[in-house]
């Protein structure tokens, strides 16, 4: 393996820019590129991020806005369009203590800095601590942005070195993304929460149990939804199209689910309530079902929220095992709902009667007509999972930052007390001191 550290003045090298003000061309001088072969191993960033022997040339990044305005410091890395290279990992030696890496708007990871050395800022004549931090990306990319984090809302960040690990862009397509939730280490998250004295809410615990079950069974969300919804009832769909009451249905309509006009919330709610009421009736009262009409509404009524409310009202009951709705009647209801969603006709005067399908034995794969529904539900669950993971990681990072600040303040206070002339000699016992502070879990 050949490794070479080069200056950033190459034509094919990535460009380095910042959201804060810097001297023209000064930021590019701090960029160092490390190119390796396609099968390269991890680099030794401990050595690459070591400060230069002759003293680092610091590049100053300053915010042009007032401290009251929220203006984080971002630096942007982007490979050339014709360079044929991709970024594997990135490391920074700067006065910012931590950094966060984003691929577009997606959070990739956080790297906490390690104190390397103390240098003297020539402009301010102050001692500056430099921290080195690096992060290996989960998947290679041609561009990323890095958020530099400093304590105390610093309006100036000094950068000594930016090291980027590059390799030739692979001709093979990137592998498919892992199953939903497979990258989440639930045991590690729960251990961190317990060590901080916090407990998960019942809703968060239920969500983690669902993710753990999905990880253990290695089933994609699409397969799980298909196992719940079962067959769409292709024969039932043909019966709907051939029946006189369903003549208004447009057979050629193939508009995807998210952009189709919506069902009224009352229609979905009444259907679900009627099904539950029917299941709770005594067996002697018969088994009759009222046919409710489904009305088409304008585009401003969201079908997405209606469907999410209907499905969310069903899922907790089914998961808890306390639902009285029999599966033989619940499955046809969901199948009919999916068929109606996929075959609605855009129009203000169009109405059609909902048919009740017979219970079907067993479940098979969802045909092509229902694929938009499963795909849309999968996107909703994936988005909620990503939002939960980001919020949890942000909360953990904030708590760790607060803990670091607290420890640093106490250590500085302890050092000052030991250096003061009134401090006791090493041979004398120390007096007991109670700060009266309590931990978050109530212990002292």
Curated annotation (Swiss-Prot):
Reaction(s) catalysed by this chain's protein: ATP + H2O = ADP + phosphate + H(+)
UniProt subcellular location: Cytoplasm; Mitochondrion
Protein EC: 3.6.1.-
Location of region: Disordered: 424-444
GO cellular component terms attached to this protein's record: cytoplasm; mitochondrion
InterPro entries named in the record: PAAT-like (IPR028043)
Pfam families: PAAT-like
UniProt enzyme class: hydrolase
Modified residues (Phosphoserine): 177, 182, 254, 302
Assigned keywords, A-Z: Cytoplasm, Hydrolase, Mitochondrion, Phosphoprotein
GO molecular function: ATP hydrolysis activity; identical protein binding
Compositional bias per record (Basic and acidic residues), positions renumbered to this chain: 431-444
Record-annotated disulphide pairs: none
Assembly description: Homodimer. Interacts with ABCB7, ABCB8/MITOSUR and ABCB10.
Role, per record: ATPase that regulates mitochondrial ABC transporters ABCB7, ABCB8/MITOSUR and ABCB10. Regulates mitochondrial ferric concentration and heme biosynthesis and plays a role in the maintenance of mitochondrial homeostasis and cell survival.
Protein name: ATPase PAAT
Organism, scientific name: Rattus norvegicus (Rat)
Gene label: Paat
